Amino acid sequence: NVPETAYAANMSDISVTSTREDVQQVVDDGNFDYTELDGTEIDHIYELYNNDPETIKQLQRQSDYNATGDIATLSARYTHSSMFDGYKVIKGIDVSEWNGDNINWKKVKAAGISYAFIRVGGRYYGSGKYFIDSTYKDNIKNALNAGVDVGVYFYSQAISTSEAKTEAKYTTDLISGYNITYPVVMDYEYAWEDGGLSGRLYNAHLSKSAATHVIKAFCAAVESKGYVGMIYASKTVITDDMNASSIAQSYPIWNAQYNDTDTLTVKHSYWQYSDVGKV
């Protein structure tokens, strides 16, 4: 008998004729690197994953974890901003269909998770059309049944106040009838394409003032429906691309900063310290 030789899929196995299974194998083997893809290959991968605008980001996250095993856990120690000295830290997670359709929410609750932000949908970064997260209804229902408080987020690509208001209405319509007690979040981030930042939001190059008006329009529209509006963005975007201090006067901010120390100095209420984790 000839022994089988272990085979690891790599980036050379990805082309414009690859199947979703081909791409996923490269990810599972920890060898996915979006910087090695050309524009047509990236477009093909987006199509394989139903044009979800978070595809490249999520595949890279999964691959990086599979390659290193570096993952955030509740037991790790993280240093919060000194502005929270004396505060009680409450732990939560954020999920989408990228986390699968069989989350055991009772185990999530038992692991010490008090709340979850659940993706309900978003806007495609190219066409500007909306999409719905296929797992949001079950995630909301099952999280609530397990005693996990729920907030939601919408992947935004709004470039005007009118678009922001429309996104807010779309989001609140989707969650009507559910007991949403945590914020309704505008996920304000740039898309990845051709090895760099892209998409209608990034390409609009909004001024800090214009971006601030867009964000406030979303939050105000959400607030008018009885929810708390909130903005999610990376520390860099919060610092460089919006008037965060002005936003913080009226609405909470969720800081995405992936390290063991929260260094954002502007007032904020939530800190996402990792983009991969388990409970």
Can you annotate each of these PLM segments?
Residues I14-W105, S246-V279:
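Functionally critical loop-and-helix segments that line ligand-binding/catalytic clefts
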Residues E97-N99, G122-Y124, S156-A158, Y190-W192, ...:
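Active-site-proximal loop/turn and secondary-structure-junction residues that shape catalytic pockets
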Residues V26, L48, S96, K107, ...:
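Structured segments of extracytoplasmic/periplasmic soluble domains
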Residues A67-G151:
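N-terminal carbohydrate-binding/catalytic regions of secreted carbohydrate-active enzymes
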